Amino acid sequence: MPAPFECPVIRQRNLAVLLLGLAGNPSAPPEALVRLAAANIDRTQLARRRDLPAQAAVILADDKDANLRSELAANPNLPAEVQIVLARDVDAQVRGRLAEGAEYFTTVGVHARRFPGPLSDDVYELLARDPEPKVRRALAFNRHLPDDIRARMLDDHDVRTAAIAAAEWHPAPTARISELLSRATGAFGRELLLLRLDGPLPAEAARGMLADIDSSTDPANSAGLLRQIAATAVLDADLTGRFLTDLPLRAAVAANPTLDPEHVAALAHDPDNQVRAAVVARRGLDPALRESVSVEYDDRSSGNAVEWLLAEDMSEPDQLAFARSRHQVFRKTLAMRTDLSDEAVGILSADESFAVRLFVCERQPNAPGWLLAHIAAGWKSYSRWDMLAHKNFPADAATALARSDDPHDRVVAAAHPGLPFETIEALLADDTDYVRRRAATNPSLPTDRLMTLLEADEPAVVSGAAANRTLLVVTMHQVLDQARL
């Protein structure tokens, strides 16, 4: 057995597998990542790393593989000098990937949506003048696009680019609504535009769109747009009457902040459950009226959050009041926030609603271990991985999952640091290769055992051991030396 600080002699056939594992090792230092950038392996995982050093990014940006450069372009943490290089890339796919600034998912919180920061102004200017319409269209989707550049793109000679630039303005200026509607002429584009308006839709603009819909040969295609008009327009008596007589629009108009109090009070007793739910979710509604309204919610649905509650500045008494609300939608939305007091988390942890308890496990840094264990035992979705990584997840519950007959249970538990050594060893000999690989990443493996795994005959185990965050940096460099990097 090799000494703890001595790298084993790596079999040549395992060298590429080792390098792939190192590329995903969260503890790999910047200098190791720079060396890996020149490796003859699939480096897409390396290109996606948020901690990719600038020097490594420069190397990857000059690579001949367009798919690799495209993955690099999607990395939200690139230095400006690399962004400029990619904005001038010969491949339109690479430039478009850089331009879109698409959302990505992270396990900080729980696979919560994150959006990259803005690109440099020079990059935006360059991409806005790109000769390929598909690149400019991708840029028009970018939520960080400066307003002056977006305004210029409203006059793009490519009609589709101009329409996207209008519909994706976030927040869209109500003062320019006529101009924006003249560009976003499709029903779906207009629906998106109204969703992003920075204020209520002027009644005159609403009437203009309604006239277009009424004269359309396919009014059914505008059902979503109609609901958005009803929810955002400045309501007068005529508009209110029209919307309230159309049953599919009653819930939308019930959510409209300009609806007069008399109609709000009447709709609170509407026979339609969706209409009452829309009334209940109104911002500024009298708490007594809200709590008097009966609404049924789909307990297995993660949708229907109360958006304003997510951003509301709340005191602890406010938190506790919503945590005890009769309405599941408020308790569920509250559970999505990460600034809750221990008392509020305690109340929500014992909630009768599965959806509320699930969000406690997914979003709360102080979620109780007993609840994490209970939910993870039966919850098979992606967020279970985050629950097992939660600092409060009990070791005995992880061990029970690791000994399950289901490999999907075993793999999710295989990297838990609280597993007994004999359980980890059993997982390393598991019948399923992805379980064995995951077990090799367990941070509780002793250094000498980890070193022997680097010499294993099986690529899955070798790759997992190389990705283990406790692997010594000196060993990483010794592997890179053997690869002549």
Segment roles from a protein language model:
Residues 1-485:
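Alpha-helical scaffold segments
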